[in-house]
C-alpha cells in the first residue's frame, strides 16, 4: 500500500510539474531546423545526442529530432564554446523515442568535451594543428577522421570509446575506468600513453612510444617504433602486433 501511494503521488507530481511545452509526452514527426550561431572552437556535448561533424569553411548547424523536442535542444555559444544539451523533461513518461542528431559544418573546431551518451562522427577529415577529444564522463562512441600535428584522446571516467583515422606527428592518450581508445589507424611519430582502464588501447607509432600501464588493460602497438619506454605496475601488458 505504501509503495502504491508513493507511485501515485510521484506520477501526480510529474504530471503537474511538467507543462505541455517543457514535458512533451510524444516526440512528434522528425523535423529539423537551421540555427545561426556565433563562431566557436570547442563543442561541449551532453545527453544522448548524436553529433555529426562535416568539415567546411562555412559554419552551419542543423538540429534534427521529433518536432515536439526541437525547442528543448539547446545550442548556446559562450566564450567560443558551443554547449549542446537536451533540456526536454519527462523522458521516462514519453510514449515514443526520437533520435537527436546535430549536424555541424565548421572549420575552426579544435576540441570536443564529451559528457554524453550519443555517438560522434565525421563525414570527412578534420584538419587542425592541435585537436582534443576529452571524455569527461561520456558513454558513447567517438569515431573521427583526423589529420593533426598533435592529437589528444582522453577518457576520464565511464565506458566511452574513441577512435581516430588519419595521421599526425604526436598523440597523447589517457584512458581510465572502462574506456577504450583505438588509434591503430591514426599513424603518429610519437605517442605518449597512460592507461588506468580495464580495457585496451591500440596505437600505430613509427618513432617513440612511451607507455605507462597502471591497470588491467593492454596496450597494443603496430608501426615498428624505433624507441620504446614503458612502465607497467599491474597485469596489463605492452604487446606488439604483426
Map each language-model feature to its residues.
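Sec-dependent bacterial lipoprotein signal peptides
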Residues: 1-18
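Hydrophobic alpha-helical segments, principally membrane-spanning helices and signal/leader peptides
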Residues: 2-4, 32-35, 64-65, 101, ...
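Single-residue recognition of alpha-helix boundary sites
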Residues: 13-15, 58, 226
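Solvent-exposed adhesion/ligand-recognition segments of exported proteins
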Residues: 65, 73-79
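Short acidic/polar N-terminal linker immediately downstream of export determinants
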Residues: 18-68, 87-105, 120-122, 236-242
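Short carbohydrate-recognition loop motifs
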Residues: 80-87
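Extended, compositionally simple hydrophobic/Ser/Thr-rich segments
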Residues: 41-53, 102, 109-242
Amino acid at each position: 500500500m505504501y509503495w502504491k501511494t508513493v507511485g501515485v503521488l510521484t506520477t501526480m507530481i510529474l504530471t503537474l510539474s511538467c507543462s505541455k511545452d517543457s514535458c512533451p509526452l510524444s516526440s512528434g514527426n522528425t523535423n529539423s531546423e537551421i540555427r545561426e550561431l556565433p563562431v566557436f572552437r570547442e563543442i561541449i556535448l551532453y545527453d544522448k545526442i548524436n553529433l555529426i561533424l562535416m568539415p567546411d569553411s562555412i559554419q552551419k548547424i542543423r538540429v534534427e529530432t521529433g518536432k515536439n523536442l526541437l525547442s528543448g535542444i539547446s545550442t548556446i555559444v559562450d566564450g567560443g564554446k558551443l554547449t549542446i544539451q537536451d533540456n526536454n523533461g519527462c523522458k521516462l513518461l514519453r510514449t515514443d523515442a526520437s533520435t537527436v542528431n546535430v549536424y555541424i559544418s565548421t572549420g575552426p573546431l579544435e576540441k570536443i568535451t564529451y559528457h554524453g551518451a550519443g555517438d560522434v562522427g565525421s563525414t570527412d577529415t578534420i584538419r587542425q594543428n592541435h585537436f582534443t577529444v576529452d571524455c569527461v564522463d561520456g558513454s558513447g562512441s567517438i569515431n573521427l577522421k583526423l589529420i593533426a600535428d598533435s592529437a589528444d584522446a582522453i577518457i576520464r571516467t565511464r565506458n566511452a570509446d574513441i577512435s581516430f583515422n588519419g595521421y599526425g606527428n604526436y598523440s597523447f592518450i589517457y584512458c581510465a575506468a572502462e574506456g577504450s581508445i583505438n588509434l591503430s589507424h591514426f599513424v603518429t611519430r610519437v605517442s605518449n600513453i597512460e592507461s588506468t582502464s580495464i580495457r585496451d588501447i591500440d596505437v600505430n607509432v613509427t618513432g617513440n612510444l612511451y607507455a605507462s600501464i597502471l591497470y588491467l588493460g593492454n596496450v597494443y602497438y603496430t608501426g615498428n617504433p624505433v624507441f620504446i619506454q614503458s612502465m607497467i605496475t599491474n597485469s596489463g601488458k605492452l604487446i606488439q602486433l604483426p
